[in-house]
UniProtKB/Swiss-Prot annotation:
Superkingdom: Bacteria
Gene responsible for this protein: cyaY
Keywords on record: Iron, Metal-binding
Database matches in PANTHER family: FRATAXIN, FRATAXIN, MITOCHONDRIAL
Pfam families: Frataxin_Cyay
Role of this protein: Involved in iron-sulfur (Fe-S) cluster assembly. May act as a regulator of Fe-S biogenesis.
One of the protein's GO biological processes: iron-sulfur cluster assembly
Listed SUPFAM superfamilies: Frataxin/Nqo15-like
The family this protein is said to belong to: Belongs to the frataxin family.
Protein name, entry field: Iron-sulfur cluster assembly protein CyaY
Species in which this protein is naturally found: Klebsiella pneumoniae (strain 342)
């Protein structure tokens, strides 16, 4: 994967997250902000999830209250380089825990 392909795929992730949160109709307040390639999801309780891209490594990094995760593209899924869990699974788990209700991005 070259740098432009990496950015295209990361942009697609960001867009999906932003669209899902724009359509969010849950009880808790969840905001999303993109600044300089970093996507920040802010929750009503003051907690945050930070997602950023690591261009030199062609990885997407996810920081949650539970910890930090690094994802490599394998086929058409971003997969954690330690646990093997997918980006979407870990993001949904963290967002649901931090929101206090089920949050889905897929």
């Amino acid at each position: 994967m070259n740098d432009s392909e990496f950015h295209r795929l990361a942009d697609s992730l960001w867009m999906t997250i932003e669209e899902r949160l724009d359509d969010w109709d849950g009880d808790s307040d969840i905001d999303c902000e993109i600044n300089g390639g970093v996507l920040t999801i802010s929750f009503e309780n003051g907690s945050k999830i930070i997602i950023n891209r690591q261009e030199p490594l062609h990885q997407v990094w996810l920081a949650t209250k539970q910890g930090g995760y690094h994802f490599d593209l394998k086929g058409d899924e971003w997969v954690c380089d330690r646990s093997g869990e997918t980006f979407w699974d870990l993001l949904e788990q963290a967002a649901s825990q931090q929101a206090g209700e089920t949050v889905k991005f897929r």
